[in-house]
Curated annotation (Swiss-Prot):
Cited InterPro entries: dCTP_deaminase, dUTPase-like_sf, dUTPase_trimeric
Class of enzymatic activity (EC top level): hydrolase
Protein EC: 3.5.4.13
Disulfide bonds: none
Active site: E138 (proton donor/acceptor)
Assembly with partners or alone: Homotrimer.
GO MF annotations, alphabetized: dCTP deaminase activity; nucleotide binding
Pfam families membership: DCD
Listed name of the protein: dCTP deaminase
Source organism (scientific name): Xanthomonas euvesicatoria pv. vesicatoria (strain 85-10) (Xanthomonas campestris pv. vesicatoria)
Length: 189
């Protein structure tokens, strides 16, 4: 497996709609000229943005967190340009970008250093071959203070690894439970 360059990412996005919407360069300023957390194509990856759709975890129901029987009432839905995550808590969001992963490619997501250096960790499982959808992002606030996430700015970097052999069974072939997801998607079993 080898990591793919900006040239490959641009070609796959433009010719095969791998990423929509797609930004071929790095965007570092908003329309008013103010600095933002960058997004778009980098040398060996693609920096994604989160949408304005957030689900912030709350313990108001004092329930046990169980991935097999997750209570959707454990979240407060927020639509905003900014999301405040309570101390030692987490929020879910989704990417602005919709992904269509090629059959010979695996995508690994890493958090951006701007957030990591503030104690905000982004977690996403790998995007498997032939998976498609909006990526659900999990932000953990590891600090004892509230933390801010900005919508429509960079939050994580996707790294694309192309195998030297096409997989026998893709995510699509298996009928993966998160195939084609749109919006913030809660745990499924």
């Amino acid at each position: 497996m080898s990591i793919k360059s900006d040239r490959w990412i641009k070609r796959m996005a433009e010719q095969h709609a791998m990423i929509e919407p797609f930004e071929p360069g790095q965007v570092k300023h908003d329309a008013a000229g103010q600095r933002i957390v960058s997004f778009g194509t980098s040398s060996y990856g693609y920096d994604v943005r989160c949408s304005r759709e957030f689900k912030v975890f709350t313990n108001i129901n004092s329930t046990i967190v169980d991935p097999k029987h997750f209570d959707p009432g454990s979240f407060v839905d927020i639509e905003s340009d900014v999301c405040i995550i309570p101390p030692n808590s987490f929020a879910l969001a989704r990417t602005v970008e919709y992904f269509r992963i090629p059959r010979d490619t695996l995508v690994v997501c890493l958090g951006k250093s701007t957030y990591a250096r503030c104690g905000i960790i982004v977690n996403v499982t790998p995007l498997e071959p032939e998976w498609e959808g909006h990526v659900t992002l999990e932000f953990s606030n590891t600090t004892p203070l509230p933390a801010r996430i900005y919508a429509n700015e960079g939050v994580a970097q996707m790294l694309f690894f192309q195998s030297d052999e096409v997989c026998e069974t893709s995510y699509k072939d298996r009928g993966g439970k998160y195939q084609g997801q749109t919006g913030v998607t809660l745990p499924r079993t």
